[in-house]
Every structure is written in structure tokens, then in C-alpha cells.
């Protein structure tokens, strides 16, 4: 079974996210549990928490089909130790918010070396930061998102994801989220059956499907291998519809949140419907 949704607004309170998801016919969703462009936020109050559980129950969407996303400011691989500590503190708060909301995974971008340290040193920093947060929390899987490799962002190679996972002490607390736009602009082709199979076979060999904990379903404005992160509406970009039809009929993507982050939210309901119609 496929669980498709979108990254919906939680403006006015996290409890609005399940309401917004239901309105577009979603069976999954992503959200920010706090303002994604600020370091700190006030704690979730009891009223907000109660409303969250009430609306979540009404939506009939299970926690395992929800993929919260952390703040864009966090860089667990930061070359400067003080800046990294600030990121770890903020990331810990995000994981604790997930615990409070009974969410079992948190999606994040791995980090950036800012051209000040090597890729390996940065990946080591990311893994160490994750291990520290895992030690202080329970029940929330840290889901590493692959990146387009724009600037000095790491995570654009399957090998980066595998390297981090290898250094995580409790493997039950780590997963990956594959963003189709990022994958494509990082150089992994999925446009034809042959290319799709080749890319995912490589993923299985290097990372492993047992770690796949969610996907971001996006078309791409830039070309294959451009290392530029710009999403497009499905079928409008350089990836095209075939890849999304392959995903919808790939059992390896069952029972995880498949989340749209496409650029025109006014057609999300339509995109969700189209994806479900692809299922044979």
C-alpha cells in the first residue's frame, strides 16, 4: 500500500497539519514542528498537544506515515565546534518535540563542510552529532535525506549515507529519505526502466532498502547531475512522469511516507490523485 501526501503548513499550530493533509486527500504528510528558520521556539503547550492528537485521530493518518522535517539552520557537520553544538542543541529539541507528538521519525539534511574541512571529517561530525542525540532520546528514527550536492552540502552520494549509517551505534534509530529531485540532480537517473533499476540496485547494494524510511516526490527544474536543488511540479520538470509511475508500482516503497514538496501547492490534491491512479 502506498501512503502519499505533501509537506503541509502547520501555521497557527502543529494540529493544523493533519487538517491540511486531509483537505488534499493525503494519506501521509510532512510538517515542521516549529519555525524552520529560527533556532529556538517556545515549548509545545498542553492545549496544542491535545489538539494535535485529536486532529491526528480524525485524519486517520498513522504516525509512521508522517515525516517531520527539522530546521534549515541546523548543520550537524559544522566545522566549527561551537556552531555545531548550537546545531546539536536545536536538533535535540526537534527530536524531543517528535517524542511529545508521538512521531517515530525526523527527517533532516545531513550537513555541510563549508569548504573548511574534508568531506570525511564532516561526515564524522554528522555521525557523532547523531549518536549524541540518539543517546539522549528514544523512539525517534533520525532520517537522513539525500541532497542535490549544492554548495558544500554532503549526502548527495549513496556512499555518504552509508558512511554515516555505519558510524551510528544504534542502527534501529537511523533511516534515509530519498528525494527524487535531489537524487536526479546529484546524477542518479530514474527516467527509464533501465536507469531506474540501475539506480535502485545501487541504492540497495550501498545503503539498503531496510533503511528507506520515507521519500520526497519531486520533479526537477535542473538537468541530471547539475548539483542544483530546484523542485518542479510532477511531469513538468526534467524527470518526467515515467519515474513516478515506476515508484508507484514498486513494492519497496510501500508503507512509508511519500511526500510531495512540489512547487504549486494548489495542485497537490491533483498530483496525489494522479499518483494513486498510476498504481496497477
Swiss-Prot record:
CDD domains: AP2Ec
Binding-site positions, Zn(2+) 2: 145, 179, 216, 261
UniProt keyword annotations, A-Z: DNA damage, DNA repair, Endonuclease, Hydrolase, Metal-binding, Nuclease, Zinc
Record field: catalytic activity: Endonucleolytic cleavage to 5'-phosphooligonucleotide end-products
Coiled coil: none
Domain of life of the source: Bacteria
Residues annotated for Zn(2+) 3 binding in this entry: 182, 229, 231
Enzyme class: hydrolase
Disulphide linkage map: none
InterPro entries attached to this UniProt entry: AP_endonuc_2, AP_endonuc_F2_Zn_BS, Xyl_isomerase-like_sf, Xyl_isomerase-like_TIM-brl
Keyword DNA repair: yes
GO biological process: base-excision repair
Bilayer-crossing regions: none
Residues the record lists as binding Zn(2+) 1: 69, 109, 145
SUPFAM superfamilies referenced in this protein's UniProt entry, alphabetically: Xylose isomerase-like
E.C. code: 3.1.21.2
Cofactor note: Binds 3 Zn(2+) ions.
NCBIfam families: nfo, PRK01060.1-4
Family: Belongs to the AP endonuclease 2 family.
Name of the protein described by the UniProt record: Probable endonuclease 4
Taxonomic path: Bacteria, Pseudomonadati, Campylobacterota, Epsilonproteobacteria, Campylobacterales
Gene name linked to the record: nfo
